[in-house]
C-alpha cells in the first residue's frame, strides 16, 4: 500500500515538473521582426560604429545564421514577408510580388488590394485575400481559439498585412499621404489606443521639425561606396508635397516610429501577460534613402545602420521592461533583396546592355504572325514575362505547347537573353536548381507563359513601372537571428532555408506549422 502511494506521489511530482518545464519553455510573447533590405555583410562592415545594446547584443546572446536563403526569384517586400510567415514559396502562397499582372483582367494587381473592405485613416482598401495559405498568425489564433493577441505593425501596408495573415486582430501601417497609422475594416474595429496616438502624437504633428543628419562625427563613416566622397548630409521632411511621408518611410526615423507605436501597444494591452502565447509582428526599413543607390547616398546607408542599431537596442529594452526577454522569443530577418544598383560605369568595360520587354513582346508577336497568320498572339507583358493569347491560339486550333516552344526559341536569340522558359517547362520539365527556383516563383493565377532570363549586368527596362533594373545573380547575404526564451547562442555560417522559420517558431509555441509549410524546424536552436 505504502509503495503504491509512494509511486503515485513520485509520478505526480514528475508530471508536475514536466508540465512546469513545458510551460516555461513556451514563450508568452513571440516578436517577429522583418527588416526590409537588411544585409548581413553591412551588419559586419559597419560594426565598429555600433553600441552594445543592438547588433552586438544580438550577436552575443542570439543564435545567428549569416546565410539564410529564400528559395525563389524576384524578392520584394510582399513575397519575402509572405514566405517568412507561411513557411513556403509563391507557388503555394500566391504572393509573387508587391504587384503582378492578373491573367483574366490583364490589369496590374497590388498584393493587398481588396475593394470589399474600407481603409481606416486611409483611402486604400486592403485585405490579405490574395494570400492562399495559412500563416503563423492564423495557426496561433486557431490553436488558442482566438484568445491570443496577434497584431502587426510596419511602415508599409504590404509588410503589415502579409505578416498579420487572415486571422490577426489588427494590422497597422503608416499612411504615405498623411503620416497617420492606418488599418483596414477587414480586421474589425480599430483600437482606441491607435486612434488616440494618431490624434495626439501622430507623425503629421512632428514631421516638419524632423531633420536627418549624421548621428556620429562624419569622420566615423569610412565605408567607401562611391568615388565622390561626401562631406556630410542633411535631409528634412518639411516640404508640403505628398511624397514627404514616403521619403520619411525610407529614413531610419520610420523604425523609431514603429517603436513608438509598439510602446503604446505594450502599455495599453495585456499582450505577454498570461500563459496564452501572443504574437507581435514588426517591420523596419534598412534600405537606401528615397530608394537611391549607395553611390548617391554612401554616408546615409552607414548612418542608417548606426541608427538601426540604436533602434534595435531600444526595442529589446522595451520588450524586456514590459514583458521580459526571458518570456519572449524574438526572431529577426531580412526581405533578402536590395533596391537596384545603377549600371556599371562604361569606362570599366563590363559587358552590359539594355533589354526592353515591350520591344521583345512586339517582335515576338510579329514572328508568330509570320508563322501562324494575322492575330494578336501576345496579350501583354510584365517584368520579364510574356502572356500569350490562349483564346486566339485555341480558335486557330494551334498547339499551345508548340507555340510556347517556338516563342522561347525565338526570344532566346535576342541580345541580352540568356534563356527563355515556357510555363510548361517550369512546371513539368526535368529538375535542375534553376527550374526549381523558377517553379517556386510561379503562380498559375498571375505568372506568364514565358519567363525570360536576362544576362547578368544587363538592365531590364520596364515600361509599366518606368524603372530600370540591373540583373545581378548574387543576392545580398540574408541574416536570421533568434533571441530570447530557451535559445542557444551561436553564430553559424551554414546556409539555412527561410522556409524553416515558420515551422521553427511554431515548434517553440507548440502549435501547428502553417498548412503549406513542409520544411522541418531548425535543430540545435534550444539550450
PLM ranges: what are they?
Residues 1-26:
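Bacterial Sec-dependent N-terminal signal peptides
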Residues 43-92, 149-153:
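Short, structured active-site-proximal loop/turn typified by the sulfatase FGly-forming signature C/S-X-P-X-R
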Residues 359-398, 467-509, 523-527:
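Substrate-binding rim/cap in mid-to-C-terminal beta-strand-loop elements of soluble/periplasmic
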Residues 76, 98-123, 133, 138, ...:
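Secreted, luminal/periplasmic, and some membrane-associated catalytic domains
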Residues 27-39, 58, 84, 140, ...:
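Beta-strand elements within well-structured catalytic alpha/beta cores of enzymes
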Residues 39-45, 68-71, 121-128, 245-252, ...:
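Second-shell loop/turn segments in exported
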Residues 89, 97-276, 285-292, 413-415:
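His/Asp/Glu-rich, glycine-adjacent segments
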Residues 249-274, 287-328, 406:
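A long, amphipathic alpha-helix that forms part
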Amino acid at each position: 500500500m505504502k509503495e503504491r502511494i509512494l509511486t503515485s506521489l513520485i509520478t505526480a511530482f514528475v508530471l508536475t515538473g514536466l508540465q512546469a518545464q513545458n510551460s516555461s519553455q513556451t514563450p508568452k510573447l513571440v516578436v517577429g521582426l522583418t527588416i526590409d533590405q537588411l544585409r548581413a555583410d553591412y551588419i559586419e562592415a559597419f560594426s565598429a560604429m555600433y553600441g552594445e545594446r543592438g547588433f552586438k547584443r544580438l550577436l552575443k546572446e542570439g543564435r545567428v545564421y549569416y546565410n539564410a536563403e529564400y528559395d525563389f526569384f524576384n524578392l520584394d517586400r510582399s513575397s519575402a514577408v509572405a514566405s517568412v510567415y507561411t513557411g513556403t514559396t509563391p507557388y503555394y502562397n500566391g504572393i509573387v510580388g508587391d504587384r503582378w499582372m492578373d491573367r483574366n483582367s490583364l490589369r496590374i494587381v497590388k498584393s493587398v488590394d481588396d475593394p470589399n473592405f474600407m481603409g481606416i485613416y486611409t483611402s486604400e482598401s486592403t485585405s490579405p485575400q490574395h494570400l492562399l495559405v495559412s500563416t503563423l498568425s492564423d495557426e496561433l489564433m486557431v490553436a488558442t481559439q482566438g484568445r491570443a493577441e496577434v497584431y502587426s505593425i510596419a511602415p508599409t501596408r504590404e509588410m503589415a498585412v502579409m505578416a498579420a495573415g487572415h486571422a490577426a486582430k489588427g494590422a497597422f501601417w503608416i499612411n504615405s499621404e498623411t503620416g497617420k497609422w492606418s488599418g483596414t475594416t477587414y480586421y474589425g474595429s480599430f483600437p482606441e489606443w491607435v486612434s488616440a496616438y494618431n490624434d495626439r502624437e501622430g507623425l503629421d504633428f512632428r514631421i516638419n521639425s524632423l531633420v536627418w543628419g549624421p548621428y556620429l562625427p562624419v569622420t566615423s563613416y569610412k565605408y567607401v561606396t562611391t568615388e565622390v566622397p561626401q562631406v556630410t548630409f542633411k535631409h528634412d521632411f518639411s516640404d508640403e508635397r505628398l511624397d514627404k511621408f514616403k521619403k520619411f518611410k525610407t529614413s531610419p526615423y520610420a523604425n523609431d516610429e514603429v517603436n513608438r507605436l509598439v510602446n503604446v501597444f505594450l502599455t495599453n494591452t495585456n499582450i505577454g501577460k498570461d500563459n496564452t502565447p501572443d504574437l507581435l509582428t514588426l517591420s523596419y526599413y534598412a534600405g537606401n534613402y528615397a530608394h537611391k543607390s549607395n553611390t548617391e547616398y554612401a554616408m546615409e546607408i552607414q548612418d542608417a545602420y548606426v541608427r538601426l542599431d540604436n533602434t534595435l537596442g531600444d526595442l529589446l529594452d522595451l520588450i524586456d521592461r514590459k514583458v521580459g526577454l526571458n518570456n519572449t522569443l524574438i526572431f529577426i530577418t531580412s526581405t533578402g533583396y536590395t533596391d537596384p544598383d545603377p549600371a556599371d560605369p562604361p569606362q570599366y568595360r563590363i559587358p552590359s546592355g539594355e533589354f526592353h520587354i515591350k520591344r521583345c513582346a512586339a517582335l515576338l508577336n510579329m514572328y508568330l504572325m509570320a508563322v501562324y497568320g494575322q492575330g494578336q498572339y501576345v496579350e501583354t507583358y510584365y517584368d520579364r514575362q510574356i502572356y500569350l493569347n490562349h483564346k486566339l491560339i485555341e480558335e486557330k486550333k494551334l498547339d499551345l505547347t508548340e507555340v510556347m516552344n517556338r516563342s522561347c526559341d525565338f526570344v532566346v536569340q535576342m541580345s541580352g537573353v540568356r534563356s527563355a522558359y515556357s510555363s510548361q517547362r517550369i512546371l513539368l520539365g526535368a529538375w535542375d536548381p534553376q527550374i526549381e527556383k523558377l517553379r517556386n516563383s510561379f503562380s498559375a493565377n498571375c505568372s506568364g507563359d514565358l519567363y525570360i532570363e536576362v544576362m547578368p549586368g544587363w538592365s531590364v527596362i520596364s515600361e509599366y513601372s518606368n524603372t530600370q533594373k540591373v540583373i545581378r545573380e548574387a543576392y545580398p547575404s540574408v541574416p536570421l537571428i533568434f533571441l530570447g526564451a530557451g535559445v542557444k547562442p551561436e553564430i553559424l555560417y551554414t546556409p539555412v532555408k527561410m522556409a524553416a522559420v515558420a515551422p521553427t517558431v511554431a515548434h517553440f509555441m507548440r502549435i501547428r506549422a502553417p498548412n503549406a509549410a513542409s520544411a522541418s524546424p531548425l535543430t540545435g536552436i534550444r539550450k
